[in-house]
Amino acid sequence: MTMSPELSQKLAAAVDRMPAFPRSVQQILQLTRDVNCSPKDLVRVIDHDPVVTVKILRVVNSAYYSLPKQITSVNHAVVYMGFNSLKNLALSIAAIGMLPKDNVAGFDAHEYLLHSLTTANIAKLLAGRIGIDPNDCFIAGLLHDFGKVVFAQFMPKEFREALAMAEWGQSSLHLALRAVIGTDHAVVGAMLVEKWRFAAELAETIRHQHGEDLIDTPMIACVFAANQISKKLKFGSGGNPCIDELPPAIAQRLGGTLDEVIASLGDLDAMFEEAKIFASS
């Protein structure tokens, strides 16, 4: 949908006021796109960020992992967690740092985070099935709703009104946002990841994840389905209880209806428990 110049300027200013993605995490993303990157390179970058280091050690030493001895260095953490899990945890920690500390606009940041983390992990599982990069889909799932954070912080009154419309079943949240504000979180989320200089495919996935704007790409298929699965299984909440069936093109890519895809994934409770640990970091 077309935005007015006034709204476009207002949103650009709000996005500009959002904090930068941590430099260490940007470096981690660059490293992991390099086929020659080793775990040692990743550890070196994380070691230079004390905040991320402390939180990683807190997670790896949690009861969830039940390790026989305490882990005191990122170098040891990568042995137990694995290269990609450590990278994804660092990304999750960065995303947590962007969230508002208070429950502004009636937006529960903790529930939102649980929804985002489980969407990320389910998108990663689905990506492995259809032969695309699971870690790119993890990032897309993690950040797919980040435009809501911009609205919660900089347009709280309007966002609260749209959340209420979605909660009472009057409309899906993205349609409620369009009615109240004039655009939705997908557009603003794409603006935000462009500011953070993520890959163009990620911005495209976030921008075109809903309704008539939905386009048929493998990454969008994974993120769209993961989003619906997280909502149906009540893994956290992004403020939008409306659950959509998989469009035919996505169902064809993933090999079934929403319920059939859920059944094929098996028990996801352990994954949700891990998301809770990540969210508490």
Residue ranges and their predicted role:
Residues 1, 257, 263-281:
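Terminal targeting/low-complexity segments that flank the catalytic cores of oxidoreductases
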Residues 1-248, 280:
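Conserved alpha-helical "signature site"
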Residues 251:
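ATPase catalytic-site recognition across NTP-hydrolyzing enzymes
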Residues 200-204, 254-265:
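Short, surface-exposed acidic
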